[in-house]
């Protein structure tokens, strides 16, 4: 049965129980009989059924309630009783069955007479007892339903129908009885569970008192209505709370609509009392008012609990008065006097109630106005109470007065000349005027008392405002902000100035009179009164005595500036306006302006705007700015254009933001200035100056009196009765006012200037605070409390003797102005002057209020009381709402006790016995729970456990405590975790990380006999390895009783933050089973811990810590409580807790910090690495600065990055302590998110579908190790592993001097390499196997990237980037898995957005341009901040799933793919000796970094697009129709169709990404605010522009600023500086040619002409460069091969094959040379020197020489390498070579394809160790020169060999 039908059934019963005719009938037939009660109930049920029959017959309600039908139904009842009941032997049984059937059909519950009159025991079972079964509960509830209807009726009728009392106590007792009646059968149970229930009246009184205080006690004398209204509303909520608690605890089987029964019964008796006893014509109004009360209760119930009074469950809502007022406003809008039947009809929307209801105030005023109208109908006259309340509460008058008092106190404590005080006064005056206008516009009678109050306060504010106008300070001020409009005549500059000023005043909440229009021709500032805005129209058009330009020099400055005033009384006016707006036809200063330095004038204009008209738009008088265009210009010549705004709104936003930024800078500037020291002499001079000023506007009679009677005295100040004259020696003469013989005009002048003079003296004293601090620090108390009397002595009001002495020690002139100030703003009460006015108003109105209130009927009182309860009871209702969320468990009892208990007990705990450092947790002070009266000890060990274990799981709006477990898992209470829906996005918050992941129920593991569940996921952060040692798993080994500590970390909704709490426990091992109950959930556990401590809601998951064997350990998690005794479940054991940690068989040794250094949720420093496991991180740059003449006078915008802390380039700067490691790791501080799962899934599915469509003909399976190592020959994008890079960790620890990276683990020649090291092979296998079940541990080395960076990123804001070196074994495992996929992504860049592998010199660049231009030429170019640091695990998982889907992986293969990829997102990072734990981001050394970054880039943009058009499926699902996109890592270009560009644009992307924690800026101008559409020619991609050539092709031109740094710094680590420089020059030639061949030719000529050492043939010719680009454009040569041939022409293969010798030869006895491919001997027969080929040797059997090739050197190394490592005496190679010679072995030199390198090496080594005379080396090398012409450099470079 639906809720409306149930409501109607209740209505039938209510009417039936209220019929006197039925009562009389039953009394007549069964009076005094045992069946009387049953018969009465049966009669009511029978009559209600008859009413239902009439209703079902579709009779109108008027017809159902007509006298005809009432008589008809009574006849049926009487007939039924006479025929079927009176003489029936089984009458009672039949009546019970009838009643039971009705209850079952109407309310789904039973009725039983046997339990009707019985007294029921408590439902709380005794020990050994059992809970009643549901059948018993249903029987009792069925009875209680009827008892409720009777008891409520009787209780309220007894209290109200007699009308003997209308007291608050009587009404609240009535409510208490009604609540008891609603639960009469269960009262013992409720009273046993809730101790506060018996004190409910006091609770309701306390709440009503608190609400009355919030209303500023305005209802004194008539507060009864508030007490009754709040009592009724709150009682309805309490009934609903108790009912839900009984249902969830299975005491009753389901909700029975108790709030409805309670409320309708209460309203029924009130209705019957008043509607039947009053005149008929007023019954309609009474019914409306009672309907208003009912609606108020139901509205509060629905807002708090998501539940109507009828009992229907709805979504839980957040309590707030605004939504409830809307409901009430909707109700009263339908009130009409035509008929009662209009009540309850469907009401219109809120917009139909009253136009302009846009705020809480408007709705409150509207409801009050309707109540006033209804009250006038009931009372016959307009209600003064409601009229006054509508203004006091609706207009927030009390709060406004309170603000005025706060401002007044601020004015007395700080300088009144401060601009912020002046503006605040203006704001309060404007607010007061608005309130006064609201009073005058009220439709009902204007409340004269309130109007008088507001007017009085306004007069005082205006007096204060006028008094501080002349208080402008002669001190440093904020520089005003100047806005300058320029443009031709007639473009509407004046209009935009006026609109800009009006908008600024509105935004700053200032009145329209705060604008001063400056007349440039007036030498005086006539009319200037420190207005906030100054405007200049036609600035500089007409020269005056002082030009406008010259005037601005002093006005727009931070120096004090006194303006010229015509009136003597206004002399000393200082300028401190905040905004200057000028309009002029001239952009520059007038040459005749007298400004000698035009730049000084120009830089004072903060924003310069040129106004012009749009050609295609006509002028609209209604919107004069609509046809204007605004161009933002530089303020200085040549006035370059900065931006263009097409609308006024855009301009206004820019100007206001610029203004606020300017004000903030000025505020910081003023706060940095020192406070000047002032002397007494200066103070006296200032006081004389004040006297001169006050004398200037004092009446002549006062001045003349001083001259005649007080020689040497100065007029100082006056009060209402006295005039004070001051002598320079300090004396003050007091003259009564009547002696002055002043006329009325003079007295008015004295009165008007009195306050102004007093404030000037007060400000002067504040400027000299060190002379007499008392007058400054205690001025507020002295003035407000009137502690100085008219005779300038301490008054009787000052009772403190010490303070009296201090006041009397003040100079008399100070006492004089303090006394005068008291006369203006003193208050006799502790409250301020303004609130005291409110008290006077209340006092004057109280008697009339009480007189009127006596005539109010009860419905009107209840209506007003319930409405005020909603306005003022928000805190109470929020508390009740918090109880609703926990009413399903035992913690409800404790929570209810804390809310319903009045007052608080004093804790009797010992003071803490540890210092404060131990009582902070995550930078928050720990709140102590003093349960046992002991001081808890929270030591370092417990803090470590809490820090690493305690976490919070956030599921939508719910939060629960969980405990991090070893590995990637957490423990939590099962009754919460099991309820989390599958597939929702949740967040795990620890002290260091925030991780979003999708909940998978399959990963939740339950343990037998435990309430704790374990959730394991590879997405979770990894807990410390040592955590498992801090868990105690064996409950049996614990003592029976032991002390413990209870630790929680819960979110406090009031404080809006997490609060740590700690308490002492005395734990016991339980001897009986525990049944954990949560809603329908039941779970019995036999093993648990108990402690008699009253835990509260949200404690589940709290940590129970105890000292075990001298060490603090976690013994359990809190899982349940019955309000008095808590229970904890022991920590369950899981085999995965002891999974071996570390990378393969290596376990890093480090000292773990007790408190890690947290950089953010995604990264923390966890400890210091042991010395034996520490590796060096470099620190020396490979860049060499070239000689100055080599730099060719080209600018250098980039220099080498900072590699180590303490770089000399930063010495003496603010960045001297810059640490590149510490700062670089901050990029991993926080992952992006959260991502909505459905949208993310849809986006990833669409990308995977695109892959499938493009995958035809591609293999995706894994490759073997050989292919992963060597690549596949002649297969594009299948390159070999780069062996010159680092081998990673831990292999780096084993590297010996002279050994190189990965190469030392590889043997063979390129293309045929193999790994023979067993450790590497075993580690590769380990990664492949362990990743099938879990995420492997990964140790990575962080190195600072040695690169050239912009100067600002090196000197001003150092931002060195980190490069991450991953283990070689892991990289190979990844290559085996993904190499085919990488090739697919790079190969299909023609259809995929990812452009990795693009050749910018080929036609591929043009294809990118054409793809983008297909959607139009509106392109977004984005740049991300810390892109490789924010990759979240949830997206890495999605990428892994997408790969698995396209490959077709299942089961273990899918898990392996996911875990391998997640390993790089969750790793250990080694930064020198500091070890970091990183939980997001992607390391730069990951083999798939650029691919994954590209996919992430694509996902982010498509996800943003999907969310942008989430509700528009026709656009949302067709990304490629409206958008074209290319990505390369974090670079992207997004071409957007014009059809959607208004919505999907740069502003949307910036804001959307910001919500995900991602900062996006313009990719071209990274300092620009926002992202705007660009044309393709203006876009950057891979630092290249798009240039369209004459033939229609496109070139990727690189900006020249990226080229010139190559002339300043070269990388010469592997080659000589000159060789590297030549290579850089050739690279510059290639790039310059793309932009202009002429520039390339000019650059080549310049290099040759200025650098004589550069041989022309070593530079590429222009024709060679042109040929190179032609070949690239036509795709004839791969890019790398073409570059290699161009730059190393002498290394090209011989024209005739076989020209170089390749066979093994014995060139001397025992000396052999050979080539790799043609050697057929046995290496065991030789001592081998292997040239460039990786080969491992046994000790004493040879060595290898690995070197970089020199440019054009015939396969030999550079000259520097030969000199240092071959020819130099005592070098390592010579030593190893001599050892081989001394053993008498045959010596074999072997090189790769030819014997020539081996031959030359052999000769040079023999000569260097003196085994070969110079003559023979000459002959041998000359022979080699004859065979290989490329060795022609040898005689020149090595003359000692010839």
Curated annotation (Swiss-Prot):
Pfam families in UniProt: Peptidase_C3, RdRP_1, RNA_helicase
Positions of ATP binding: 487-494
Marked site: Cleavage: 318-319, 908-909, 934-935, 1143-1144
EC number of the protein: 3.6.4.-, 3.4.22.-, 2.7.7.48
Annotated GO CC locations: host cell endoplasmic reticulum; host cell membrane; host cell perinuclear region of cytoplasm; membrane
Known catalytic reactions: RNA(n) + a ribonucleoside 5'-triphosphate = RNA(n+1) + diphosphate
Residue stretches spanning the membrane: 883-903
One MF term in the entry's GO annotations: ATP binding
GO biological process, one term: proteolysis
Keywords: ATP-binding, Covalent protein-RNA linkage, Helicase, Host cytoplasm, Host endoplasmic reticulum, Host membrane, Hydrolase, Membrane, Nucleotide-binding, Nucleotidyltransferase, Phosphoprotein, Protease, RNA-directed RNA polymerase, Thiol protease, Transferase, Transmembrane, Transmembrane helix, Viral RNA replication
PTM sites of type O-(5'-phospho-RNA)-serine: 909
Name of the protein in its database record: RNA1 polyprotein
């Amino acid at each position: 049965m639906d809720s409306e039908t149930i409501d109607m059934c209740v209505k039938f019963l209510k009417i039936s129980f209220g019929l006197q005719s039925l009562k009389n009938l039953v009394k007549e037939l069964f009076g005094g009989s045992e069946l009387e009660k049953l018969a009465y109930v049966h009669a009511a049920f029978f009559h209600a059924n008859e009413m239902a029959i009439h209703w079902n017959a579709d009779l109108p309600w008027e017809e159902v309630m007509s006298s005809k039908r009432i008589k008809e139904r009574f006849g049926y009842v009487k007939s039924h009783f006479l025929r079927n009941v009176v003489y029936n032997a089984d009458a009672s049984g039949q009546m019970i069955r009838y009643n039971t059937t009705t209850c079952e059909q109407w309310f789904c519950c039973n009725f039983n007479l046997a339990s009707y009159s019985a007294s029921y025991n408590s439902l709380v079972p005794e020990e050994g007892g059992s809970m009643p079964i549901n059948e018993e509960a249903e029987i009792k509830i069925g009875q209680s339903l009827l008892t409720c209807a009777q008891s409520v009726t009787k209780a309220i009728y007894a209290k109200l129908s007699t009308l003997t009392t209308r007291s608050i106590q009587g009404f609240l007792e009535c409510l208490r009885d009604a609540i008891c009646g609603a639960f009469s059968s269960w009262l013992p149970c409720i009273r046993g569970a809730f101790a506060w229930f018996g004190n409910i009246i006091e609770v309701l009184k306390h709440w009503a008192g608190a609400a009355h205080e919030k209303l500023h006690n305005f209802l004194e004398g008539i507060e009864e209505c508030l007490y009754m209204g709040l009592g009724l509303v709150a009682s309805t909520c309490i009934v609903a709370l108790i009912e839900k608690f009984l249902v969830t605890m299975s005491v009753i089987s389901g909700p029975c609509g108790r709030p409805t029964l309670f409320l309708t019964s209460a309203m029924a008796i009130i209705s019957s009392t008043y509607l039947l006893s009053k005149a008929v014509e007023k019954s309609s109004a009474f019914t409306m008012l009672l309907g208003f009360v009912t609606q108020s209760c139901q509205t509060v119930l629905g807002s708090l609990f998501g539940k109507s009074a009828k009992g229907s469950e709805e979504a839980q809502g957040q309590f707030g008065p605004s939504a409830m007022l809307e409901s009430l406003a909707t109700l009263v809008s339908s009130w009409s006097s035509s008929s009662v039947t209009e009540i309850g009809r469907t009401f219109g929307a809120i917009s139909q109630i009253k136009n302009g209801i846009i705020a809480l105030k408007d709705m409150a005023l509207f409801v009050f106005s309707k109540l006033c109208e209804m009250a006038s109908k009931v009372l016959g006259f307009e209600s003064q109470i409601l009229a006054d309340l509508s203004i006091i509460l609706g207009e927030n008058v009390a709060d406004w007065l309170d603000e005025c008092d706060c401002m007044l106190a601020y004015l007395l404590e700080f300088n009144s000349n401060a601009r912020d005080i002046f503006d605040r006064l203006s704001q309060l005056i404007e607010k007061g005027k608005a309130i006064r206008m609201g009073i005058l516009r009220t439709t009902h009678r204007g409340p004269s008392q309130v109007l008088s109050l507001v007017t009085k306060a306004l007069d005082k504010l205006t007096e204060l405002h006028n008094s501080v106008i002349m208080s402008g300070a002669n001190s440093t001020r904020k520089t005003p902000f100047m806005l300058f409009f320029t443009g031709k005549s007639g473009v509407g500059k004046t209009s935009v100035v006026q609109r800009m000023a009006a908008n600024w005043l509105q935004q700053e909440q200032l009145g329209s009179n705060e604008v001063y229009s400056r007349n440039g021709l007036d030498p005086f500032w006539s009319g200037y009164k420190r207005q906030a805005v100054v405007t200049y129209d036609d600035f500089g058009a007409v020269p005056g005595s002082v030009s406008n330009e010259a005037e601005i020099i002093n006005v727009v400055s931070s120096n004090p500036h006194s303006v010229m005033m015509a009136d003597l009384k206004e002399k000393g006016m200082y300028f401190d306006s905040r905004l200057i707006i000028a309009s002029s036809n001239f952009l520059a200063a007038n040459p005749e302006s007298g400004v000698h330095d035009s730049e000084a004038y120009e830089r004072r204009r903060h924003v310069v705007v040129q106004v012009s008209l749009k050609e295609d738009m006509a002028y609209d008088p209604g919107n004069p700015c609509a046809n204007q265009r605004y161009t933002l210009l530089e303020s200085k010549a040549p006035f370059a254009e900065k931006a263009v705004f097409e609308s006024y709104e855009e301009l206004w936003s820019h100007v206001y933001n610029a203004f606020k930024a300017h004000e903030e800078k000025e505020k910081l500037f003023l706060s940095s200035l020192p406070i000047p020291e002032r002397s007494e002499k200066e103070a006296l001079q200032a006081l004389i100056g004040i006297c001169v000023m006050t004398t200037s506007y004092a009446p002549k009679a006062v001045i003349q009196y001083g001259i005649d009677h007080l020689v040497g005295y100065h007029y100082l100040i006056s009060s209402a009765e006295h005039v004070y004259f001051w002598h320079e020696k300090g004396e003050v003469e007091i003259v009564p006012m009547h002696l002055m013989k002043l006329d009325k005009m003079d007295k008015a002048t004295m009165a008007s200037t009195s306050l102004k003079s007093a404030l000037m003296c007060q400000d002067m004293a504040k400027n000299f605070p060190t002379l007499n601090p008392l007058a400054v620090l205690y001025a507020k108390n002295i003035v407000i409390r009137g502690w100085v009397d008219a005779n300038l002595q301490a008054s009787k009001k000052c009772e403190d003797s010490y303070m009296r002495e201090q006041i009397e020690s003040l100079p008399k002139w100070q006492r004089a102005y303090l006394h005068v100030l008291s006369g203006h703003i003193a208050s006799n009460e502790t409250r301020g002057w303004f609130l005291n006015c409110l008290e006077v108003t209340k006092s004057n109105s109280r008697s009339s209020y009480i007189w009127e209130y006596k005539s109010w009927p009860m419905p009107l009182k209840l209506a007003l009381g319930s409405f005020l309860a909603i306005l003022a009871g928000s805190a109470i209702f929020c508390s009740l709402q918090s109880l609703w969320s926990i009413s399903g468990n035992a913690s409800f009892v404790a929570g209810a006790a804390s809310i319903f208990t009045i007052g608080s007990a004093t804790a009797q705990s010992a003071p803490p016995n540890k210092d404060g450092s131990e009582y902070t947790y995550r930078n928050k002070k720990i709140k102590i729970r003093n349960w046992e009266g002991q001081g808890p000890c929270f030591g370092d060990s417990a803090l470590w456990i809490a820090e690493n274990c305690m976490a919070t799981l956030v599921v939508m709006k719910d939060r629960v405590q969980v405990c991090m477990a070893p590995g990637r898992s957490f423990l939590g209470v099962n009754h919460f975790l099991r309820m989390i829906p599958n597939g929702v996005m949740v967040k795990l918050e620890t002290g260091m990380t925030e991780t979003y992941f999708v909940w998978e129920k399959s990963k939740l593991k339950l343990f037998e006999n435990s309430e704790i569940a374990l959730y394991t996921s590879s997405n979770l952060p990894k807990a410390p390895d040592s955590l498992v040692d801090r868990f105690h798993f064996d409950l049996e080994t614990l003592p029976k009783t032991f002390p413990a500590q209870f630790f929680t970390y819960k979110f406090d909704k009031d404080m809006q933050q997490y609060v740590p709490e700690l308490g002492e426990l005395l734990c016991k091992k339980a001897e009986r089973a525990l049944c954990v109950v949560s809603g329908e959930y039941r779970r019995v556990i036999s093993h648990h811990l108990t402690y008699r401590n009253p835990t509260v809601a949200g404690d589940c998951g709290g940590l129970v810590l105890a000292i075990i064997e001298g060490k603090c350990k976690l013994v359990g998690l809190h899982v349940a409580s019955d309000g008095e005794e808590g229970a904890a479940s022991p920590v369950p054991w899981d085999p995965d807790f002891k999974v071996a940690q570390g990378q393969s068989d290596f376990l890093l040794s480090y000292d773990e910090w007790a408190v890690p250094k947290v950089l953010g949720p995604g990264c923390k420093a966890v400890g210091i690495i042991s010395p034996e496991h520490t590796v060096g991180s470099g620190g020396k740059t490979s860049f060499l600065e070239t000689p100055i003449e080599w730099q060719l006078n080209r600018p250098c915008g980039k220099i080498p990055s900072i590699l180590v802390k303490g770089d000399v380039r930063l010495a003496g700067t603010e960045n001297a302590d810059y640490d590149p490691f510490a700062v670089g790791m901050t990029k991993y501080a926080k992952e992006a998110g959260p991502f909505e799962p459905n949208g993310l899934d849809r986006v990833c599915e669409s990308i995977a579908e695109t892959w499938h469509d493009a995958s035809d003909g591609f293999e995706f399976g894994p490759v073997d190790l050989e292919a992963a190592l060597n690549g596949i020959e002649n297969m594009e994008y299948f390159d070999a592993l780069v062996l010159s890079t680092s081998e990673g960790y831990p292999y780096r620890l084993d590297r010996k001097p002279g050994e190189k990276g990965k190469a030392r683990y590889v043997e063979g020649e390129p293309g045929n390499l193999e790994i023979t090291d067993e450790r590497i092979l075993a580690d590769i296998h380990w990664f492949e196997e362990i990743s099938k079940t879990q995420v492997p541990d990964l140790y990575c080395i962080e190195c600072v990237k040695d690169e050239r960076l912009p100067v600002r990123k090196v000197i001003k804001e150092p931002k060195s980037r980190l490069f991450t070196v991953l283990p070689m074994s892991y990289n190979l495992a990844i290559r085996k898995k993904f190499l085919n996929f990488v090739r697919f992504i790079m190969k299909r860049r023609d259809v995929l957005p990812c452009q990795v592998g693009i050749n910018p010199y080929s036609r591929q660049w043009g294809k990118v341009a054409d793809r983008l231009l297909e959607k139009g030429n509106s392109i977004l170019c984005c740049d991300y901040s810390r892109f490789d640091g924010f990759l979240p695990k949830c997206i890495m998982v999605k990428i892994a799933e997408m790969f698995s889907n396209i490959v077709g992986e299942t089961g273990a293969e899918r898990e392996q793919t996911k875990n391998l990829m997640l390993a790089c997102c969750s790793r250990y990072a080694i930064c020198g000796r500091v070890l970091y734990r990183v939980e997001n981001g992607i390391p730069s050394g990951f083999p798939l970094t650029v691919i994954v970054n590209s996919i992430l880039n694509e996902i982010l943009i498509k996800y943003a697009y999907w969310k942008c058009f989430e509700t528009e499926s026709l656009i949302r699902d067709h990304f490629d129709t409206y958008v074209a996109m290319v990505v390369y890592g974090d670079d992207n270009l997004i071409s957007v169709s014009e059809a959607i560009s208004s919505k999907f644009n740069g502003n949307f992307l910036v804001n959307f990404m910001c919500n995900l924690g991602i900062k996006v800026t313009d990719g071209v101008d990274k300092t620009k605010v926002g992202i705007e559409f660009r044309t393709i020619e203006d876009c950057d991609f891979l630092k290249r522009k798009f240039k369209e050539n004459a033939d229609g092709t496109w070139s990727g031109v690189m900006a020249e600023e990226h080229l010139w740094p190559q002339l300043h710094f070269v990388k010469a680590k592997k080659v000589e500086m000159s060789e590297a420089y030549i290579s850089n020059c050739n690279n510059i030639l290639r790039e310059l040619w793309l932009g202009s061949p002429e520039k390339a030719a000019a650059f080549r000529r310049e290099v040759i002409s200025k650098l004589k050492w550069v041989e022309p043939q070593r530079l590429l010719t222009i024709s060679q460069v042109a040929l190179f680009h032609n070949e690239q454009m036509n795709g004839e040569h791969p890019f790398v091969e073409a570059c290699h041939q161009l730059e190393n022409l002498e290394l090209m293969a011989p024209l005739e094959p076989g020209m170089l010798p390749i066979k093994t030869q014995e060139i001397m006895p025992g000396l052999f040379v050979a080539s790799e491919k043609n050697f057929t001997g046995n290496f065991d027969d030789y001592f081998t020197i292997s040239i460039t080929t990786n080969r491992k040797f046994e000790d004493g059997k040879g060595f290898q020489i690995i070197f970089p090739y020199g440019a054009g050197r015939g396969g030999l190394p550079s000259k520097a390498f030969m000199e240092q490592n071959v020819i130099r005496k005592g070098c390592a190679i010579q030593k190893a070579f001599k050892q081989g010679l001394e053993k008498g072995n045959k010596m074999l030199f072997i090189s790769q394809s030819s014997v020539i390198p081996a031959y030359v090496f052999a000769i040079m080594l023999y000569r260097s160790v003196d085994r070969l005379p110079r003559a023979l080396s000459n002959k041998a090398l000359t022979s080699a020169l004859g065979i290989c012409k490329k060795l022609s450099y040898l005689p020149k470079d090595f003359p000692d060999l010839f």
